[in-house]
């Protein structure tokens, strides 16, 4: 969500404080440009499993050289709720794209689609940002009958996969072919 390009896994000894024990080992990995939280979590699980095995072998062999954790200010992640996972279409397109990837597969970024005076809750699963001039007011939906696009302040967002309330996830093409719509996000 915040544009980090690298992440990793750490093994450490537990002490009386949360996340303050001595570091045993660490492995880093690059966050891929189109990677969402679900895909990244799968990669980190595998990386973490390998690191746990290496750590246990080091402990068993008595070859552990720990380092203290850096003394940094504690930052608690906000609890994800419906109120703070709603898309803000007036944001920078790169921020919106990262927000969607960071909340995928759960809890999912969402928006409200307006269609002929009716508002529908809609989860957004996959988007692609196209930088350029602002075509319409941010949040306005436009289409060429093949792609569902939303105007943002510095270009447009292609909404590739979405899920209307009480429906299965679908591509934008499936939505455009299956529904009569006059949309606004």
How would you describe each model-predicted region?
Residues 71-185:
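Internal anion-binding site segments
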Residues 1-83:
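Donor/substrate-binding cores of folate-linked one-carbon enzymes
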